[in-house]
Regions:
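Secreted/periplasmic carbohydrate-active enzymes, especially glycoside hydrolases
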Residues: 1-404, 447, 463, 483, ...
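Substrate-binding/catalytic cleft of secreted carbohydrate-active enzymes
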Residues: 401-632
Length: 788
């Protein structure tokens, strides 16, 4: 099935002073091929880093502008110092401060023809003065913004920035109504309201605790000649035995007259160069080019080496005049094609059809295995080392996709995941409910365009999603209209990727075994693409992070995101546990069993209808009790090991619907083998052994859920006391064994046999399975059952 025609990205208005603002006025400029790729004798481009110690002063009464704190002659001797980049949370007096904070920095004039002042990331409002003159403002947290300062510089300069991370008054209500009634004012996604961040999402006064404000990314002076690059878009198109790359170059001429320059391009990996003569008109110019690459190496996710690897190309672009390089830019890109199966319904809300939500990369069907992701809300703390470490965790658990959940990470994440071959489902920065007036809608549309432009060239980004859990309910129809407009805009801008209107619609968020019901109820479901499922678990380190952690105090634990009453519903009252460690271990065992069961069920239903699954989520990014399988110190918990096993490329498993059986009952367990490799494994054997062992039974308590935390939206309340059979002692006597032969085809999921047993007396059992080819064990698994 052919997808839509792929074209270069369409342009749409962005936020004032965005780095993409010049593109809107770009003039189409003709180019002429030129001979040779000349070396240059002098480079006029570069940058001056303004990071380091800045002066700052909080402005609780908002008097700074009236009192002229932007005046370069103002003495700032009594102002304190702060490292930039940083977040307000790094300074105790600013951790819960929502008024303006003023920053000042002195610097010398650099030697350059053209100078731009670049802010790579400020959260959330910024107003900028240079030498007492106001340059402008910016709103948002993820998109860089800039000002031309060439003619405003002195020998000694004073830069002043007023930054405010506002308190969102749209977060209101009480208890669960906080989520339903909130009409937030600022599109910050999970960064200011979420059930996995500091505070208490059921308490609007605490929900925004330890905010994310600050100058959290570097500030730089960009130096160049009078003609410089604004941006480059790269759009790869796969063809038979070749690829065509659409190259859209935006460059600005800051002079008053047209000027002829050379545009030099080089793709390093294929050792090819091109040179063009360009007549750059005053203002921004758009140059459209194409480059044919024969027998291209394609970008594939890391876990399919039989298909390819995440190959990247490097495009070096230079603007040259009279042997001088006025500016240069390096863009890395991958050649890959992504298609999401199924057809959109008439409203564009979901995909339908037999291939709905099945993923195709470069024409090859790929079963998605992954999780939701947030590195930290305090983005000044990220680094290449942190992202590479998280990539190792993701790949170590056999995952090939993350959903960057209702926020945007700094560009470094996307660079690392391009290199590592990890696919990204990228949410726009909307979470739950918002105001939906025309002004807010237009703001969101401009920011959505910025998101797409900023990360357009990254092959790891395979989908844009406009909103997470928008809560389209009868008294909040505005959100539906907002999402319709965002979906239409994203579809018009980027024709190279699938667009999803709202997560939770079409894809599935399933919390059976947490927000009601039992996790084994998922066996009855047929979901094309679950993108959230999981339960909370307590890290053993949690006791070190908060005072008086045991016995648990509801208010303190809730501040750290713990849904204690739900934990007790599925684990039993904390009072029956002898220690914090015992309670924490029970939570991890329960989470591990739940995640393992979910993933195995989704893989049994592979392509019938399930195209993949994403757990919620990888890590608890701050000291908290959350849905992560890794704690904030990056220590894996039991749930991580469960996902690692359940996501293995080859899986042997049983399709069970109960783990506790009656005495004398004939138990029959269907055995399934799943192969995600696109290679035939041929003849293999499934071997199984049954042991007498000593298991652990975790028994819940129905009263906790209803008494402690009323949740009216639960559509499947807990009618039965949850009982979860978990590993206990690993020893035990072997009772029986067996084996059968199987043919394991490529990219398949098949029922291959059955294991049966019957016991007349109570017994604890451990079932061990292995998939064997010759002397090699390709996969193994184990289960725990009780006969009572």
């Amino acid at each position: 099935m052919e997808g839509p025609r792929i074209e270069s990205p369409k342009l749409y208005p962005v936020m004032p002073n965005s780095i993409f603002s010049p593109l809107l006025g770009a003039k189409e400029t003709e180019v002429t091929p030129a001979s040779g790729y000349k070396s240059v004798k002098r480079h006029l481009h570069g940058f001056v880093e303004l990071s380091g110690r800045w002066k700052f002063r909080p402005d609780p009464q908002e008097l700074g502008e009236k009192e002229g704190w932007y005046n370069p002659e103002l003495s700032d001797d009594d102002w304190e110092e702060m490292e930039v980049p940083s977040n307000f949370v790094d300074n105790p007096q600013l951790q819960n401060f929502y008024k303006p904070v003023w920053f000042r920095r002195r610097f010398k004039r650099p030697k350059a023809e053209e100078v731009r002042l670049l802010f790579e990331g400020v959260d959330y409002f910024a107003e900028v003065w240079l030498n007492g003159e106001k340059l402008g403002e910016h709103e948002g947290y993820f998109c860089p913004f800039q000002f031309r300062v060439t003619n405003k510089l002195r020998e000694d300069n004073v830069l002043v920035v007023k930054v405010q991370n506002p308190f969102d008054r749209g977060i209101r209500g009480r208890g669960f109504l906080t989520t339903l009634l909130s009409t937030k004012h600022y599109p910050k996604g999970v960064l200011n309201f979420h059930d996995c961040r500091p505070g208490d999402s059921l308490n609007p006064k605490l929900a925004q605790s330890l905010g994310t404000g600050g100058i959290y990314r570097p500030v730089k002076l960009l130096l160049s000649g009078r003609i410089h690059f604004d941006w480059i878009f790269l759009t790869p198109l796969l063809e038979e035995k070749s690829a065509k790359v659409l190259i859209d170059v935006f460059l600005s001429n800051k002079g008053k007259t047209p000027e002829k320059v050379e545009l030099q391009l080089e793709i390093r990996e294929i050792k090819e160069t091109r040179t063009y003569e360009v007549t750059a008109q005053p203002g921004c110019n758009r140059v459209r080019l194409q480059w044919q690459i024969k027998n291209p190496k394609l970008w594939f996710p890391w876990n399919h080496p039989e298909l390819g690897r995440p190959y990247l190309y490097s495009l070096m672009a230079r603007i040259v005049k009279d042997d001088e390089c006025l500016d240069e830019r390096l863009e890395r890109f991958g050649i890959r094609e992504v298609r999401l199966g199924g057809e959109l319904d008439k409203k564009g809300d979901r995909r339908i059809g037999p291939e709905a939500y099945q993923w195709f990369i470069n024409g090859k069907k790929i079963f998605v295995k992954g999780t939701n992701y947030l590195s930290t809300e305090w983005m000044s703390k990220v680094s290449r080392e942190l992202y590479e470490g998280d990539a190792r965790l993701i790949k170590g658990a056999n995952m090939n996709m993350v959903r960057v959940h209702a926020h945007l990470e700094p560009p470094l994440l996307y660079e690392v995941f391009d290199e590592q071959g990890i696919m990204i489902w990228q949410d726009f920065t909307l979470q739950w409910g918002y105001r939906a007036d025309r002004e807010f809608r237009e703001k969101c549309k401009r920011m959505l365009a910025e998101m797409i432009y900023l990360y357009y060239n990254h092959p790891s980004v395979v989908l844009w999603c406009c909103h997470n859990e928008p809560l389209w309910i009868w008294f909040k129809v505005g959100n539906k209209g907002l999402d319709d407009e965002l979906f239409e805009l994203a579809t018009s801008i980027d024709s190279s990727r699938p667009i999803h209107k709202a997560s939770g619609k079409g894809d599935s968020h399933i919390y059976l075994g947490w927000y009601g019901g039992l996790f084994i109820d998922v066996r009855k479901r047929r979901d094309p693409f679950p993108t959230e499922f999981g339960s909370q678990a307590i890290s053993l380190g949690f006791k070190r992070w908060i005072e008086d952690a045991w016995p648990p105090k509801m208010r303190k634990w809730r501040y750290h995101d713990a849904q204690l009453s739900i934990l007790c519903t599925y684990l039993g009252s904390w009072r029956k546990y002898k220690s914090f460690e015992e309670f924490a271990l029970a939570s991890q065992l329960y989470q591990a069993e739940l995640l393992k069961y979910y993933v195995e069920q989704f893989r049994i239903k592979k392509y019938n209808p399930t195209g993949g699954c994403l757990s919620f989520w990888l890590l608890n990014w701050w000291p908290s009790v959350g849905w992560g399988v890794v704690d904030h110190e990056r220590n894996p918990m039991l749930g991580y090991e469960a996902l690692k096993q359940a996501y293995s490329p080859l899986l042997v498993c049983v399709d069970w619907e109960r783990s506790i059986f009656k005495k004398g009952e004939e138990v029959r367990l269907p055995v399934w083998v799943v192969n995600d490799w696109h290679e035939d494994e041929g003849k293999c054997s499934v071997k199984w052994k049954l042991f007498r062992t000593k298991n652990r039974l975790i028994e819940g308590s129905r009263k906790w859920l209803l008494a402690e935390l009323p949740l009216p939206w639960l559509n499947l309340p807990v009618f039965h006391v949850p009982r979860t059979v978990c590993p206990g002692e690993e020893g035990g006597k072997q009772l029986s064994e067996g084996s059968f032969e199987v043919e394991v085809g490529p990219d398949s999921s098949q029922e291959v046999g059955e294991i049966s047993f019957k016991f007349a007396e109570p017994i604890d059992l451990r079932l061990e399975l292995s998939l064997v080819k010759g002397k090699r064990v390709l996969a193994s698994n184990r289960y725990h059952f009780l006969v009572r």
